[in-house]
Amino acid sequence: MANNSKIIIAVIISGIIGFFFGKKSKDSNFSNFSDGGGVFPCPEPTKNLELNTRNRDKAIKADWIQYGALNLSDKAYYIRLAKHWNTSVAVAKKSTCGNCAAFDVSPRMKKCMSVGELQDKDGAFGYCWMHKFKCHSARTCYTWAKGGAITTDKVSYGWQERNQ
């Protein structure tokens, strides 16, 4: 084997080892989560209440996101949402985080979010890959996308890969 090939192989192996066992920078978006003998990263907001709250608050305030309704009986929110989507209030109310393509309730994400109660009378919490915070299935936002929720680890890892 040529010396260049050995160097390339060594760099690849070093990169793989560094990825799984290396030190993370202070601004890393992920923390480690052990799953069946392997190490997989959990999104940092699932483990960091301050970061999660900051991201959620930004999603509430951002004109282009408008995460809500904070009070599920807030009629004005759903009227605004329906107007934004050019649809009826009834249709807008059916487009929730719980059926959004970015709403992750996979088994591994439930383990990542294992702090506190994940379910209440209105629904359950999941992780929003679009806006990087734990969101509630009964709420919605302007960036809702058809096709969810994420219910398998494989799809969850795919979203994570695209978000790095």
Q: Where do the PLM segments sit?
A:
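Single-pass alpha-helical membrane anchors
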Residues: A2-K26
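Membrane-engaging insertion elements
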Residues: K24-G36
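Cysteine-centered metal-binding/redox modules
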Residues: F33-Q164
